[in-house]
Amino acid sequence: MSPEDVRERYEQVRDEVGPDVTVVAATKYVSLAELGVLAEAGVGVVGENRAQDLETKHARYGDAFRWHFIGHLQSRKARQVSDLSELVHSLDSESAAKRLTVPALVQVNLSGEESKSGLPPERLEAFLETCPVEIRGLSTMPPFAEDPEESRPYFRTLRELAERFGLRELSMGTSQDYRVAAEEGATYVRVGTTLYGGSHR
């Protein structure tokens, strides 16, 4: 993984999704040493999945990036995540919301898969009415599919939900379907494999 390769791929993704979409580099499988390559490549926003990894990486490269949290948010880690990131993409519990002090996107489970985090859509309205933190939008993770078009109905449904509640930000789309997500109104896409190649997810 060289800075030149990452920069080329990063710029390609940015060109594909357009100026209104923020490309978040997913760093779950990026080592501490490799983060320096991302910084050298000009990556601006990174998304971390685990609070402990966020703490470790932020301690070394805190000023090099804007930090987002994109993994499942445990209530007991919410304050730690708040101290280190500017936006949480994955809020889905009242207990975590009470401890969070940075803006968030509510994660919605549109597929009904038990393996996926997120609120069921029928609970979204009540959650938004009582949520004590600033909610800027919604996020979702559709079922994995080889064909990106299979993700489109989920992205469209999320956009319609956001419009219903007057929310502007949409975090949806990963390496295999970010182009479709952008077409359906994503304002954040999370990419890993696309930036780093086959050895990273």
Q: Regions from the language model: what does each represent?
A:
Residues 3, 179-183, 190-200:
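Expand to "…catalyze enediolate/carbanion chemistry for C-C bond making/breaking, isomerization
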Residues 66-67, 189-191:
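Short alpha-helix boundary/capping motifs
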Residues 1-176, 182-184:
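Conserved alpha/beta-domain cores
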